[in-house]
Structure formats: C-alpha cells, structure tokens
Amino acid sequence: MVRVIYSKEFEQDVKKVRDKAVKERMIKQVEKILKNPEIGKPLRYNLKGERSVYVSPYRLVYALVDDKIFLLRFRHRDDVYE
C-alpha cells in the first residue's frame, strides 16, 4: 500500500490557498496520483526524481520513493520550481 507524506512546505503552501475549488481539485489530483503514481510529468535537472501535475493555476510537485509518495510543493506555476 502506498503511503502519503506531506512536507512542511507543502502544508504551508496549501494553507495559503483560499479558493476551496482549487483545494478540491488538488485532492482529486492526489487521489489520481495514489491510483497511478507515475501520472505526473517527470521533472529534469535539479528536480530530477520529482514529478508535477497541473491543478489550474497551481502545480503539485511530488516524489515517489519505494511505496511512499512525498507531496513536496503546491504553488502557482510561475514560482513553483524556484
């Protein structure tokens, strides 16, 4: 069974989002990730090993390690990769 681990940075990012519709879409994307962990776009360069899914207008960045999914960041697409 896959285990989900939330980073502190991810939790802080989610708290900043006030739009409930965005949070609901984010939850649906997390459910999709649980069903198929490789659904996200693989990232490159210094973010190699991480994946990203789009939750308009945000990006959810996560990493899959063994049977664990680490939710790393949930930020606006303009500054998520900084």
Language-model regions, residue ranges each:
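Short, well-structured alpha-helical segments
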Residues: K23, I27-E31
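A short, surface-exposed loop/turn module that caps and links secondary-structure elements
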Residues: V30-Y54
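A short alpha-helix capping/helix-coil boundary motif
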Residues: S7-F10, K28-Q29, E38
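Enriched for short, Lys/Arg-rich terminal
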Residues: M1-Q12, K16, K20-E24, V55-R59, ...
